[in-house]
Amino acid sequence: MSSEKFTSISPAEFFKRNPELAGFSNPARALYQTVRELVENALDATDVHNILPSIKIIIELVDPQKQIYKVNVEDNGIGIPPHIVPNAFGKVLYSSKYVLRQTRGMYGLGVKAAVLYSQMYQERPVEVVTSPINSKRIYFFKLKIDVVKNEPIILQKTSVVNEKNWHGTSVTLYLYADWQRAKQKIYEYVKKTYIISPYAEFFFKDPDNNVIYYKRLTDKIPEPPKEVKPHPYGVDIELIKFMIVKKDKPVPVRDFLINEFQSIGDVTADKILEMAKLPKDKKTTELTDEEISRLVEVMKKFDDFRPPSAEALSVIGEDLIKLGLKSIFNPEFAEAITRKPKAYQGHPFIVEAGIAYGGAIQPSPEPIVLRYANKIPLIYDEKSDVIWKVVTEEMDWKRYGIEEEQPPLVVMVHLCSTKVPYRSAGKESIADVEEIEKEIKLALMDVARKLKKYITEKRKEEEAKKRLITYLKYIPEVSRGLALFLVGGDKQKIGDAYSDLREKLLKIALNKLEVNDKKLEEEIRNYKVEEL
């Protein structure tokens, strides 16, 4: 009987064999995913560093026979140090995003998965042009990934003098793609990205030479997230071991707890060590696996920790959400809310919600749902997302004044967290987590109450208008009768008296019915009735 042969493969080879795990399941999805990964990197290189983003996206068909497209995304961000570029684009699971703060990316995979997919169907390398802020040179790279070794292959590296003090990054990828099937999703992605980042400007040119430009509407950038220490509720045995190894030298376990974790001070550290039956002065490198396991178990069950710090999070903010919704949908009503920070499994999170109603919004059987996670629009896998579930199944919109069978309603939800519970590495839908689901519903209820108040007031005004119009029908007849009486029946003199009486009676009607809406009042004044 022959024996099985065991081998290992590199992370690069694993994702080359399984591109669908990173969202590259077919030529259409691959094109969308490439644009998305490059735009996310561009935004993280700009707004996180308080730079107003200017992002250019160009897609060109360069080989019609083989369906090879060229994708270029350029930003005005902080740039990439030249010694970092090869690994940033040529080493899978190498990233600046393995930190405890909110980032758009989280796996160190995105752009490398695009490079791997690119290599599978054509021979051109990824091209990177970058210049860090205050750099005197602009650097040019052509790279591929050594799939077996998971290492970058540098095909070309040059630099030129930075005469115009440009800073930022431009990335060009060539890939086998299907523009016609990806077109709608890419346009949707760019539009939805702009909705929550109206402080950015986007230039987009597609393979059909169509150009769209979203202009910057404000200079207000959300407060960027800060890196924080781990919260005790989010630890596990391997994390503790990793943190111990990462320390330059052994330290007493008490000092380790106080200095390496948030929410642990002197008193709390003493309580934890007492419950875990560990001496305060024992060195971290002397801890056995059983002692580390005990320590983690106590930290998980300890009740007196403060909630995780929300400093690691960056919300969009109510003003920017409303601005984005108004600019794209032109509604008659737009409101938003940002909830207070909550936590799940030791990770802080914040839910934001926005609603736009009426105006230019097209009626539809179900609300138009805009889903976001860490400022990323989620386009695919809508029905499997907890946001969709809450909006369409758990919210009774009729309770909030929406009675239409096909309401003109847009519902936006944004979840930001140091760890978004995505259902897969493709980052397209959020899993059902009880704490998050509850906060989404509470956020929607909060903003829906504002919508109900608006709809109620609007209906009152419409009823007032109907009643006033009823009165108006009698004003000409009453005015003419009184005018004739005042001028002694002389129809030649009735004109001025009639106009004066008609205006006075109209004012009485407006005041009596408490019409305070100037627009409505003007509409009523211009209302034409048949004068008897």
UniProtKB/Swiss-Prot annotation:
This is Type 2 DNA topoisomerase 6 subunit B. Homodimer. Heterotetramer of two Top6A and two Top6B chains. Its EC number is 5.6.2.2. Relaxes both positive and negative superturns and exhibits a strong decatenase activity. CDD domains: TopoIIB_Trans. GO terms for molecular function: ATP binding; DNA binding; DNA topoisomerase type II (double strand cut, ATP-hydrolyzing) activity. GO terms for biological process: DNA topological change. Keywords: ATP-binding, DNA-binding, Isomerase, Nucleotide-binding, Topoisomerase. It comes from the Archaea. It holds the Pfam family HATPase_c. HAMAP family: Top6B. Transmembrane segments: none annotated. Belongs to the TOP6B family. The keyword Nucleotide-binding applies. The keyword Isomerase applies.
